[in-house]
A protein has these predicted regions:
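N-terminal, active-site-proximal structural segment of metallo-dependent hydrolase catalytic domains
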Residues: 534-608, 613, 619-625, 668, ...
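His/Asp/Glu-rich, glycine-adjacent segments
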Residues: 2-4, 13, 97-267, 383-386, ...
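Secreted, luminal/periplasmic, and some membrane-associated catalytic domains
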Residues: 6, 36-38, 59-62, 67, ...
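A long, amphipathic alpha-helix that forms part
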Residues: 231-232, 236, 259-301, 326-335, ...
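Active-site His/acidic residue clusters
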Residues: 245-279, 389-393, 496-497, 666-668
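Conserved beta strand-loop-helix elements of the APE1-like EEP
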Residues: 94-98, 148, 468, 607-608, ...
């Protein structure tokens, strides 16, 4: 009865949902017939390291994420980013299964000699095309927002590879548009207030930049860029994801950039960067609730980050010259002072909105080449740079030049590769070969030392890597070649330690000797959606029991009708699979009844879970049966199935039955009786005495 009341109010709430009405008003296509099928929402918090998240949780910056762990059985795991520790490499691995798809955020194409910058649409689209040829897109038939790649999504917006955001207004008439604006008036007011607040914060930062002697025009551009990314883009992405949940898309992926934006500018642990996490936390709450209330699909929500950030010092601030000028002096070539160093990604992200302000912000910041001269080219965006000398040198010459870059150029680490593919790291302590000397290079206490060493070899062997690979991070210092206080892409412990906040029953195998990485998440998503071999949609299996236990589950399924009023034995099977039980005792199952589409619910659930079962009908009706069942993966034998006693003279009460089975597990026989007692105390006592009698 309580479930029916809750279901009634849920239907009312769904009927009044703004997302549902907007979908109708704008005529957006829906996925039909998928109400009981599994769906997943992937939420990425760009640039948030596992330690920074724990700090934010401790300071109550992300109260909703805390609630998920305390009340919704979510678990927090460290997640290794891979190398380079940036978004293109992480999304290449997650979306397409390809590790180290790029050698840096900016590099030279070995085929045509062009400089590639992954924030540029043409470059991102070309790499995405290559990835799609090598691996299957994870986001097929779904949507993707605010990333580098679309992941094969049917719909994508605000991505570097697919700049587009007007699809939701396409085809809407004036009346629908007016209703849309009125219905979301509070949201617009809220966004306006946040924009004003963020402008105030950004202007304060602008003044500090001028005092520090920064360029007026460039500092002025940062003000609307940060506002657009931290507030406007976040709200647009949130709204689109909520609409997609109402439409029933099978997979929805969205990326919140605000923290990463502020962390680059002010540092990963700065108060400004952590302030953005409160807004992100609230946005996640809205998306999570929209997904859970969706009547179009049975959604699960996973939350993760792609990488962290290292607190860094700008190279030019530390050494009084740009990395381009330093390299030109080392290679004895003239340097054009008009060619400035590469900037970070902050300004360029504003163009992803495809708004006039984005094009204004971007004006003058694009570069056709980042080099001291045409002979020697340097690409250095973030703490990883590549040097392309344009001349062939012997191994001995390259080794001497690498040492000179470290000693005279004050670059913390330089990697070079010999003719046999051996990778060597040069720093102020000497020359080391990877992966054997990983501890000497990265420190014995690095949390991902083995994986970092292996991925560093892959990065340096990438066909587009330079003859010299520059790293601003070392065990002693963290530099970034652009002017930024937070950086990532290198092998540092903070920048390579992201996080994954997953439901405790997510089908993700937790490695025993390493951290999770994007490939593990990818396989978990594929299994959850039924795309992996042998998987069924929605399987959420615990694969990591620490000890051998007999896990028994009891579940009153209420004829497989949920609180949302949807009939779905398959959804019941998904719930059971969450807990990976050895034995399942089910009550209130329908078999052949018109009210539940005349299906055998026990058989459907058992078949879906690949279990054997026994069913006993407590009630025999003309239209079918109603009763209890026991399911198990182990050999199961029926011992007894019979009706229980009823109160004399109270034939109106629902008849009750019991089902006794014997289950063999690893040579031991376990006895189990499944029943559903009556509602009154007298009735329950009578039925309990019956089970304690000689017949049982």
């Amino acid at each position: 009865m309580i479930g029916r009341i809750e279901g009634f109010f849920l239907k009312i709430r769904r009927a009044l949902s703004r997302s549902e009405w907007i979908v109708r008003l704008l005529g957006l296509p829906r996925v039909k017939g998928a109400e009981s099928e599994a769906g997943i929402v992937l939420i990425q918090i760009d640039g948030l390291a596992h330690p920074q998240l724990k700090k934010a949780l401790k300071k109550h910056r992300m109260s909703f994420l805390n609630k998920l762990m305390q009340k919704e059985d979510y678990a927090l795991h460290p997640l290794y980013s891979g190398l380079p520790s940036n978004t293109p490499a992480f999304q290449g691995e997650l979306f397409y299964g390809i590790q180290t798809c790029v050698p840096a955020f900016s590099y030279q194409n070995s085929v045509n000699g062009e400089v590639i910058r992954m924030y540029e649409p043409e470059a991102a689209a070309a790499m995405q095309k290559h990835l799609a040829e090598e691996g299957e897109g994870l986001l097929q038939d779904g949507s993707s927002y605010s990333g580098i790649f679309s992941g094969g999504a049917m719909e994508s917006s605000f991505c570097a590879a697919t700049l587009n955001w007007r699809k939701n207004l396409h085809g809407a008439n004036a009346f629908s548009a007016a209703i849309f604006i009125l219905w979301n008036s509070w949201s617009f007011i809220r966004v306006a207030g946040l924009l004003i607040l963020e402008v105030g914060l950004a202007l304060g930062d602008f003044v500090r930049g001028l005092v520090a002697g920064q360029d007026l025009g460039k500092e002025l551009r940062f003000v609307p860029a940060r506002v657009a990314i931290s507030i406007l883009l976040r709200e647009l992405v949130t709204m689109n994801a909520m609409l997609d949940a109402a439409r029933g898309l099978p997979i929805i992926q969205l990326n919140f950039l605000g923290y990463d934006e502020q962390a680059h500018r002010r540092g990963p642990s700065s108060a400004f960067a952590h302030w953005t996490l409160k807004g992100i936390d609230h946005a996640i709450k809205r998306v999570w609730k929209a997904a859970k209330r969706s009547g179009a699909r049975d959604y699960e929500v996973w939350i993760y980050s792609d990488h962290g950030q290292e607190k860094s010092i700008p190279y030019e601030s530390a050494h009084g010259r740009s990395i381009e000028k330093a390299i030109s002096e080392i290679f004895d070539q003239p340097h054009d002072d008009k060619i400035s160093a590469e900037k970070g990604i902050q300004l360029q992200r504003a163009e992803w909105l495809s708004l006039p302000i984005g094009r204004w912000l971007f004006a003058g910041s694009k570069r056709t080449e980042t080099s001291p001269t045409p002979e020697t080219r340097v690409t250095a965006m973030g703490p990883v740079g590549h040097v392309y000398p344009g001349i062939v040198a012997t191994w001995e010459e390259r080794l001497l030049k690498a040492k000179e870059i470290v000693e005279k150029g004050k670059v913390p680490m330089v990697a070079i590769t010999d003719e046999n593919g051996g990778v060597y790291m040069i720093n102020d302590e000497g020359r080391f070969q990877l992966p054997v000397d990983a501890a000497a290079v990265f420190g014995i206490d690095h949390p991902h030392i083995k994986a970092v060493a292996q991925d560093m070899v892959k990065l340096c062997r990438h066909p587009d890597s330079g003859d010299y690979v520059l790293f601003g991070w070392s065990k002693k210092i963290s530099l970034s070649f652009p002017g930024e206080n937070g950086a990532h892409a290198g092998p540092g412990p903070a920048e390579t330690t992201a996080f994954a906040l997953l439901p405790g029953t997510a089908p993700v195998t937790l490695p025993t000797n390493r951290a999770l990485r994007a490939l593990d998440l990818r396989e978990g998503v594929r299994e959850f959606l039924g795309r992996a071999p042998g998987a069924f949609p929605g399987r959420r299996r615990q694969k990591n029991r620490k000890q051998k236990l007999l896990r028994v589950m009891t579940y009153n399924v209420h004829s497989c009708i949920g609180m949302d009023g949807k009939l779905s034995p398959e959804r019941i099977a998904r719930v059971i699979a969450q807990y990976d039980p050895d034995i399942v005792a089910l009550q209130e199952l329908d078999v052949g009844r018109r009210r539940t589409d005349a299906i055998d619910q026990a058989e459907v659930i058992a078949r879906t879970l690949e279990m054997d079962f026994h069913f006993h009908a407590a009630m025999q009706l003309e239209e079918g049966e109603y009763g209890n069942a026991v399911l198990s993966h182990h050999p199961i034998h029926l011992v007894r199935a019979a009706q229980l006693q009823r109160l004399p003279g109270r034939r109106i009460l629902e008849p009750r039955g019991a089902l006794w089975v014997r289950v063999e597990v690893e040579g031991l026989c376990h006895q189990l009786i499944n029943t559903h007692f009556g509602l009154s105390r007298r009735e329950r006592l009578l039925q309990c005495e019956d089970l304690l009698g000689p017949d049982w």
